[in-house]
Amino acid sequence: MRTATQHIYHNRFQEAFPELNTSNEVREIQQFLISKGYNLGHWGADGDLGRMTKQAIYNYITAQSNGENSIPTNPTIPANNTLIEEFKAIFRRKNYIFLNENLQLNIIGIRNLDANADFFDDELVVIWKENNINNVKRYPVTTDPGKGYLQNVMINPKGTAILKAGQYRNAYKLGLHRGQYLALVQRNGPVTVYRDNNKNGSLDFMTGSTDTGFFGINIHKAGANSTNVNKWSAGCQVFKREVDFNEFINLCKKSESTLGAGTKFTYTLLEKRGVAIL
């Protein structure tokens, strides 16, 4: 049986990593990379050969080839208080509000600006204070529509919606997503989206026309642990894993029970290039 290092080198020139066909092999490599200090995000050793794992493998091989003794090129995840202070600084620069009262949730999407669609390669960060203690949760999500809509079906004749980065104050509330289950729904205020209508399957950030209004850009879930976005998102912000979404919604319910029925939630979408801490 190959060691994790041998698996990495065996797949050095195989972009698709075809030999790594079991989650146990992938998990073994992930554990090895984490032990060397590589940042796989909060996904950790989940057995899923995602983009962060592939990037970490590439970085490890590059470091070895350059004689760098496998020094990781990805930064480690900062401690909660450091992360919170960095977000506060970003919000101040952008004139965004940062919520500091008990159980007021700062819900923050971090968009990876890779134009390749159909991956859960973005992140949703929740920061809040509870009983004077700071808390942070981080979840894998997509902030972009999937190829099922980008290439095939346009719900709006103007094009598929891609939520524009910005802060949407009090635009969300707890409600039913498509009448099926509790989610955060965009019913309290307008949002601005780009319209991508060329059906080329790539995400056209900042190149299309913009559209502002009520489009049902909800925050909801995909499947139990989805790999591809496909038709899970037509512009919504969508959790990769159901268990993460359930935890998030329970937190929103707890917030509402403290702040009062009909609590309004603010959603802030940032672009990763402007968030050096992640």
Regions found by a protein language model. Give the residues of each.
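A detector of low-complexity, intrinsically disordered, Ser/Thr/Gly/Pro/Ala-rich segments
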Residues: M1-T3, R51, P190
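Long terminal regulatory regions of eukaryotic proteins
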Residues: R2-R12, A16-L20, P75-P78, T82, ...
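Short amphipathic alpha-helical segments, especially helix-boundary/capping motifs
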Residues: T3-I8, Q31-I34, H220-S226
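Short acidic, glycine/serine/threonine-rich helix-capping segments at coil-helix boundaries
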Residues: Y9-N74
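Cell wall/extracellular polymer interaction/catalysis modules
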Residues: N69-N230, D244-F265, E271-G274, L278
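Local cysteine-cluster metal-coordination motifs and their immediate loop/turn environment
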Residues: S233
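Cell-envelope and extracellular/periplasmic
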Residues: K240-R241
